[in-house]
Amino acid sequence: PFGISVDLAHELGKHLGVEVELVVFDAAGKSVEAVTNEQADVGFFAVDPVRGQGISFTAPYVLIEGAYLVREDSPITANEQVDQPGTVVTVGKGSAYDLYLTRALKSATIFRAPTSPTVVDVFVEQAHDVAAGVRQQLEYDTMRHSGLRLLPGRFMVIQQAMGLPKSR
């Protein structure tokens, strides 16, 4: 594994003088569950009040934009137009933006893909109206699937932080 979370884990281990054992999960919800249940000592998460019930967070170390993706021919042109009756929004199950949109969307229907990396594939296969996700992932997905466009702006900012079980 590689990336900022892996680098931070190794730096934390050095600072504490302990060996780091990395455990990789394929979905954020599984990682949250492992830390909440003390099956892992530290995790790297998007800060969310629901997750905060079982996890204590550090100050955020990065901000990530949540964005929407639609088909090029979609009549939806702005984030404010997404929350309409009959609109189906595909999200990654248990992701930070799933938790946020579950609270924020009042009229649209949320459909949960198994993981965040599968959101756009499910959105395309199921012919849903909107895909929600991390901007960088959605930008990558527009290169894999033609005929898609990102809506301008963002619907949320995700604060990424280290977290440990509340019980500690």
Which functions belong to the PLM regions below?
Residues 62-72, 117-118, 135, 139-168:
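Periplasmic-binding protein-like
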Residues 1-2, 80-97, 108-110:
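Short loop->beta-strand "edge-of-pocket" segments that line small-molecule binding or catalytic clefts
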Residues 29, 45-54, 100-103, 121-156:
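A ligand-binding cleft/hinge motif common to bilobed small-molecule-binding domains
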Residues 59-61, 70-89:
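Flexible hinge/capping segments at coil-to-helix
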Residues 21-33, 76-77, 111-122, 158:
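Short helix-initiation/N-cap motifs at beta->coil->alpha
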Residues 12, 35-36, 82, 122-124, ...:
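Hydrophobic residues within well-ordered alpha-helices
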Residues 1-46, 51:
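Extracytoplasmic small-molecule ligand-binding "clamshell" domains
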Residues 14-24, 85-86, 102-114, 127:
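A local structural motif
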